[in-house]
Amino acid sequence: MALPQPLKPINVPQTVQQAFELQRRGKLPQAEKLYADVLSVRPDYFEALHMLAVIKLQSGDPVAALRLMIGALKARPKSPEVLFNYSLVLDALGQYDEALATLDVVLSIKRRFVEAHNNRGAILEKLGRDEEALESIDRALAVKSNHTDALYNRASVLRKLGRYEEALKSFDRVLAVKPDHVKAHNNRGTALEQLGRREDALASYERALALDPNFVEAYNNRGNTLLKLARHEEALACYERALTIEPFHAEVLNNRGNVLAELGRHRDALATCLQAAAIKPNYVNAQWNAGLLQLRLGEFAAGLKQYEWRWKREERAGTQRHYPQPLWLGEVPVAGKTILLHREQGFGDTIQFARYAPLLAKQGARVILEVQPPLKSLLATIGAGIEVIGSGEDVPSFDLHCPLMSLPLAFHTELATIPAEIPYLAAAPERIEHWSGQLPQRRALRVGLVWSGNAVHKDDHNRSIALARLKPLFDVDGIEFISLQKDVRDADAQIMADDPRITDIGRQFGDFDDTAAAVALMDLVIAVDTSVAHLAGALGKPVWVLLPFCPDWRWLTDRADNPWYPTARLFRQPGIGDWEGVVGQVRQALAARLSQNG
């Protein structure tokens, strides 16, 4: 459509100069009108086409900018400046490969074009070609060492590559050139966070917020760091401040849900995560967190479906099994079929969900159960008709397959229908005999202890206890404490060496057959949320599970029993991090048990 003619004849060069001055001063609507006036009488006038294209791009209309920039290129096809701006339009349209090719042309004409090298690096980063991006940005800095955007982009790529010390130095270089660079302060904080320097990270976020009190990302990042510092109420305040600025920010809503869950406000947390997922349906963390909350609240019908989002999580990337045979989620009968059940997460998960294997065998399926090698011998006791193999062994032919942790979904499990017939595992008699000979002669109630799990588990700080915290239990007379702890941290080993009231056999264990035999010899097992708690429950042994304030979903909320393990008794932190309160409850319960036995 033709542009409207101006009301009176215009001096084209003079009008273009006026428009350029307005554009330079940031008065884009007035400049845009003058360029349009020029193009209404001179549709091919280069300066008007080029500058109006730039304004359209700055105004968020890259489609209009593209049409105008193509017109400008027809007039000056070899102009590095026009080609560079054309690459910006292509970048804005998401046409990254075309933008990259255009920048290569620019640099073949003008080799020391700093912005072209820098933008080429930024586009390579978007394409996931991070090392090449660094090379391009470094070429920009070789031309101009204090180029702020290039320094910032370099820091951002280094951070993305996990090279946090180098990223921190680059952010510091940005701030040496431009102390009020808000994004550099914010992202410097994220690099510090990754380096474990959380108080320094908070200072960086606070500097960013002092410069821009409405910077949502800085509030969000500050909240995340405060949450890791267990400053929950302050973290919540950060997220809520961010949401007053952007009420529908999905990431902030999800993080608000996380902190509400840790504060024990599970219903509020669920509503918040569902809101985040509604705003951004492909937001994996929001969908996943909503599922965990539904499961923790006992809403299995919805939660088990949401639990399938685990496969899309970044930390699970590449772990989902894909076979030519169909995935079975309960849709077809299994009678006469061979089904492979494959492990996917930790030892405790395998022990817990292997309980479904006998149910499939009862339905007429031939069951192949793949487990971690240290569990193979123990899981072989799970029942007839089930072939147990270790990970890495040859897999017999099969018709269907299912990951172990999808079995509750396949069986449409509800709280009332959890298969909880125990014991469903058994310790080997010869191992029981062996470990019986390793224990002191029984003189009292024999209690097995496990106080810490895998040190590299992401939730280890929340679920493991230092042995020193359990020392008040040792003061209860009439109890023989046995350590079933296989991996013992140095500080805990020293306590055991110095305290004769606890006998250490756990460090001698080989596989789970040894652990199971030792558990079978106990009157009671006291354990944190680790594989031994699941093992004791599966063996039908009384087990007291010590739980953090916000535990894993399978322990549910607000109850002292557990439908997965009928012999379990749960001791929950009365407040965040309050292991002293848990130990006090357990001490009283031990005294009560002894008095009943007496």
Question: Predicted segment positions?
Answer:
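Alpha-helical solenoid repeat scaffolds of the TPR/TPR-like class and their adjacent stem/linker regions
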Residues: 1-524, 529-598
